[in-house]
Amino acid sequence: MKRIALLLAAVLLLLTGCDAFDGQYVRVTPHAISSAKTPAESEAVETYMELRNSLAQLVASGAESGVIPTRNYPEASLADDIAIAQRHICTYDPIGSYAVEDLTYEIGTKNGSLAVAVNISYLHSRSDIRNITRLASIDDLENVVMKALENLDNRKVILVPDYVPIDVNQMVQDLAKANPQIIMECPIVTNDIYGLGASRLMELTFTYENSTDSQRQMRSQVKTVFDSASLYVSGEGSDNQKYAQLYSFLMDRFRYKL
């Protein structure tokens, strides 16, 4: 009796390995069970734009699999529409073209209704995708770049609406000149652009000659000088008077060789 119960349990274990669709089964091992992930289920879609947006949401969340219910979708056009949406996400969509390695789909049924099962593999981690900085306006870009320079980031990924070409290296040089007490070294910036629509994704890579620790040490030393100089030059007076005070401060504090 005990042996029969064990055999029945084994049969049930095999039958529980069902796919995202009805009536399809896969062989399951204990390792597969422990690592299996429940597919994300999207809201039901009825139009091409809803279908495409649902795919985009799966990608933006870093989901590896998902099911899109299409019970009220025109069945005759679903196959063509999902193929077009897949190409759009992988080519035109800024996050998709940056993050997606492969996006496959299968049309079937879920709970007796038409649905699309999606599987996605990525070039970047879910954490990288979710940490993309999303700007409300391109006018916010300079503040984000300044923050990256202040933090000595080696890389910054930014989603920009209404994108226009920008000389990021010139922006960084201008920020370095305007903030000498913060930016110790002007890095070389590589700007890779993803997407083909109005919104684009910018992947900025900052290359420094000096290490992060060295720059932080330099910043600490420079801050002391700036703080002292600001006290020395503070108060009312003309620009020429302040220039003279600053000159006096620098001559008293440092030795110079011509």
Language-model segments: which ranges?
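Secondary-structure boundary elements
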Residues: 215-258
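C-terminal motif of bacterial Sec signal peptides marking the signal peptidase cleavage site
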Residues: 14-17
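Generic detection of long, well-ordered alpha-helical segments
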Residues: 45, 75, 161-165, 212-219, ...
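Short domain-boundary/entry signatures in modular proteins, especially
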Residues: 121-140, 211-227, 253
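Positively charged n-region of N-terminal signal peptides that target proteins for export
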Residues: 1-4
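Intrinsically disordered, low-complexity N-terminal segments that are enriched in acidic
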Residues: 20-205
